[in-house]
Amino acid sequence: MPPAETRKLDDIAKMIVCKTHIGTKNVEDKMLSYVYKRTHEGIFLINLAKTWEKIQIAARIIATIDNLADVVVVSQRPYGSRPALKFAQHTGAHAMVGRFTPGTLTNQITQKFMEPRLLIVTDPRVDSQAVIESSYANIPVIALCDTDSPLQYVDVAIPCNNKGKESIALMYYLLAREVNFLRGKTDKWDVMVDVFFWRDPEEYENSAIGADMELNDGMGVDIEGAAVDSAAAANEWGGVSGNWGGSAADEWRNAP
């Protein structure tokens, strides 16, 4: 991997492209230390240097766990479902996307009960049920926090835009890269950040249909011409003379 300072500058440039620094018009008191400045429109901007530092801290915490299957990634926000699943795929963690079943971390008689050693959430406000239950079970929490995110029961806050699909994907991408690097699994990260982006199923289906139509056009498939050729072939077969109504026995009987 490139030197730390070069990697830091490259990562910050990616964060700017993915709009990770754009916060909201509200700010929590505990998030003020991560704010860079406030624009004329009233939007608070996040200090990306502190974001990068918090990613390094969170990655070191995750890397200390022997079995990464004990790390649970929770995301009820739709834009965070695919990044959470990809993070789990590349690190070996366990992902829980969609609705979080109450009692998963506290009720031992439920089928989905689990006792993770670490919890990662995409948004502490949306995933508040998981954060509250982790406080009952004494489970550390790492959270992607926007300027208006509550930090109660959050142990490590990664300041970022946790509402944009590009920003969420980039955060999980960088976190997975650092975890694998610290655990010695890879020296070169070949995975593209685009793989972590959330994709709309309807948009993906429409694009697939459009690609098939373009492929057919490129192959020169003429549906109308094919129909005309089929009709001509049918007429040709229909004009063939012969006793098609005779039985097979008559044909064999008259054979020399």
Curated annotation (Swiss-Prot):
Function: Required for the assembly and/or stability of the 40S ribosomal subunit. Required for the processing of the 20S rRNA-precursor to mature 18S rRNA in a late step of the maturation of 40S ribosomal subunits.
Any GO BP: translation
Subcellular location: Cytoplasm
InterPro entries in UniProt: Ribosomal_uS2 (IPR001865), Ribosomal_uS2_CS (IPR018130), Ribosomal_uS2_euk (IPR027498), Ribosomal_uS2_euk/arc (IPR005707), Ribosomal_uS2_flav_dom_sf (IPR023591)
Similarity comment: Belongs to the universal ribosomal protein uS2 family.
MF annotations from Gene Ontology: structural constituent of ribosome
Stated name of the protein: Small ribosomal subunit protein uS2
Record's GO cellular component terms: cytosolic small ribosomal subunit
Subunit structure: Component of the small ribosomal subunit. Mature ribosomes consist of a small (40S) and a large (60S) subunit. The 40S subunit contains about 33 different proteins and 1 molecule of RNA (18S). The 60S subunit contains about 49 different proteins and 3 molecules of RNA (25S, 5.8S and 5S). Interacts with ribosomal protein S21.
Coiled coil spans: none
SUPFAM superfamilies: Ribosomal protein S2
Pfam families according to UniProt: Ribosomal_S2 (PF00318)
Keyword terms: Cytoplasm, Ribonucleoprotein, Ribosomal protein
Primary subcellular site in the record, as a coarse category: cytoplasm
